[in-house]
Amino acid sequence: MTIQIKNAINSYAYDKVVSLLEKGDIVTPQILDKWEKELHQTMKQNDQKIGRNTVRELLVQYILSEFDVKAFGVESKAYQKHEISDKTIRRMKNQRKKKFADLKITKV
């Protein structure tokens, strides 16, 4: 598979996903089906040998890498920014004064 195919799919998907997200919509399987058909027809017209499943895989891969799972309407529980509480700040200041002697880490 060439970089040209990936670039064509990426440029196609970026504009579509951005417009969907601006409207407050998400990427659904039906939308992916539609995009897959359009891209596969375009690839066939340009004499590119690529299957429909591969087109869909590349679409999903690009959307996940660029927009994360939020584009599909799923909230990620893996990492979320949290505020550092005042209690934690005070505790770390006290640990620093004690040269982190109370921390439960193995020392070499």
From Swiss-Prot:
The highest taxon in the source lineage is Viruses
Looking at the Swiss-Prot or TrEMBL record, what is one Pfam family this protein matches?
DUF7570
Q: Name the chain's protein.
A: Uncharacterized 12.7 kDa protein in Gp55-nrdG intergenic region
Recorded name of the encoding gene: y04B
